[in-house]
Curated annotation (Swiss-Prot):
The gene is cobD. It comes from Thermococcus kodakarensis (strain ATCC BAA-918 / JCM 12380 / KOD1). Keywords: Cell membrane, Cobalamin biosynthesis, Membrane, Transmembrane, Transmembrane helix. PANTHER family: COBALAMIN BIOSYNTHESIS PROTEIN CBIB. Its main location: membrane. Belongs to the CobD/CbiB family. GO terms for molecular function: ABC-type vitamin B12 transporter activity; threonine-phosphate decarboxylase activity. This is Probable cobalamin biosynthesis protein CobD. HAMAP family: CobD_CbiB (MF_00024). It is a multi-pass membrane protein. The chain crosses the membrane at residues 52-72, 73-93, 145-165, 268-288. Converts cobyric acid to cobinamide by the addition of aminopropanol on the F carboxylic group. GO terms for biological process: cobalamin biosynthetic process. InterPro entries: Cobalamin_biosynth_CobD/CbiB (IPR004485). The lineage of its organism: Archaea, Methanobacteriati, Methanobacteriota, Thermococci, Thermococcales.
Amino acid sequence: MHALVPFLLALAWDLTLGEPPAKLHPVVWFGRIAGFIDSRYKRRSPVLDFTAGLLTALVVITFAFLLSIVPFYAPFPLNYFLAAYLLKSSFAIKSLHEHVSRTITDDIEEKRRAVSMIVSRNTKVLDEAHLNSAAIESLAENLNDSVVAPLFYFLLFGLQGAVIYRAVNTLDAMLGYRNERYEFFGKFSARLDDALNFIPARLTVLLYLPLGGRKVPEYYRLARFKINSDKPMAAMSAVLGVWLEKPGVYRFPGKEPKNEDIKRALRIYWLVVTGWVIVVVLLLATGVCPCLSL
């Protein structure tokens, strides 16, 4: 089974139908497995908590791997459908656009509600400019997490790479917090997610270069606050020319972000996505990438 066919099917699925129903979404399954174990494990000590978190991650990753090889054993043409379905579940192009688009409103309370759906910070204490910033930051970060990274691992390792990456990213989203409950239980998931995103986050920055020129590397040098997630944010800030800030954590310089800048950010998002999709198609079609078949 040539990998290009399931990719094109998955891409068409994403752009037309969007996300599968929650009950049938592999990402939801990953989250439910992790949540089930998390809710039943009583915290004991740093070593035991870390070990339990590691085992939780291994359970979810093993499930993701087993799920990803199902198409290998399915008859034609069901194998193509299953491969496309699982691959589509690993990335989210249309859904990310829709979530960020909802933050474009002059109603401050509606904007707070929309932004709260895509960031973990307390939106009730944010003014309009910081709400706009948070929306753009989320778009930039998730361009890597939800588009570039899963397809990067698809190119390297096929369907298994994309699905396992999404499982790890889901684990980090659920368990990768630095608080009393997850400091040790979620540490393995958080560090594994950092490792897997190291190259894709920087690849995402490169995809901004045709749009931002020399400003992109200038802003990239300012991104010293986090291992990965601030790199795409810096690139987006450079291209837009607006400041992006999480108070007390990081700030990239520029003019105050407005509603119009979220619209501009979405246009930039689609340009970067289009460029990345073209790269993926060319690598799959020409045989340059290491993984040509599922």
